[in-house]
Amino acid sequence: MDFISMKETLKTRFFPVLVIFGDDEWLKSKAVSNVRDCLQIDFPDVNCFTYEQGVDVDELITACNTLPFFSKQKFILVENFAFPTGKKASEVKSKLENYLQTADDSCVLVFVSEESKPFEGIKGIELVNCKRLAEKQVVSWITAYCKRQGRQILPTVATKISQYCLCDMARVATETEKLCSYATSQITDQDVELLVHKDTNYEIFKLGEAIASKNNAKSLDMLQGLLNRGEQPRALFGLLYNFYRRMYYVRTTNYTHQQLADMLGVKKDWMIRQVEGIANQYKPMQLKRALDCFASCDEKLKRFFNESEEIQLLVLNLLAL
């Protein structure tokens, strides 16, 4: 199941072992809370346990088989569990499957992990996908949260919040809470512009969009705005280079988003999906020439040419592709 459906699912079904995985830390934290909130736990100090990465699976199973202390249920959380490889991986899977055959509803064991792959195929384990939400889902969350706080917000305004925060729910939640505290009834577009900080990667994405559209004036204005705000030219160079490098590989390989993310050392595959639409506006050879422009700019930066002028020249060269 995914994060969106889990709350309703947990109302009617019990799962002795769950694996919460994905790339959104806020969602994973909320998912853990959702599981714990569904349980009937008295004396949480002695019936709720958290284990770190190095815990042994035998120790976990022993803890699970120990009865709760004056409580109907207990809760065991394992953060960043290091799943072994090879023969030991098979042993761990076998032990977990054996435990699940006799597990009752007195204990819930939750693993929090970056990925689900090590746990796939273990009979009885429920996987909870907490990957970054789509923009539409984030907008729905913002709208619902504002309504609970007695605030109104238009879908277009909620969309702007999600975009400025790159659908990162930790930032979305913080910024939405801030806006609800600021506005008395209606959260407006002006409120968002005033209070919500645009993620630099979002601004690089918009800059890349403007460059791909051959909008010279907008591209140079956006770049100057970033420089005026205090962004360092070398930092902008690195972000823009990564953006074009991802586009180049999107256009020149047949890899999946996750394969590209792994190859490029990108932790989250949504960063690859993000650039796909813009990449399709270029021919592969244009993107190869773009990387050549970056190589030339990098050489000049290393020779201590004026950094601001060189990053502006780089953008002009990209516009000319």
Language model: regions and residue ranges:
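Conserved beta/loop motifs at nucleotide-recognition and modification sites
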Residues: 1-321
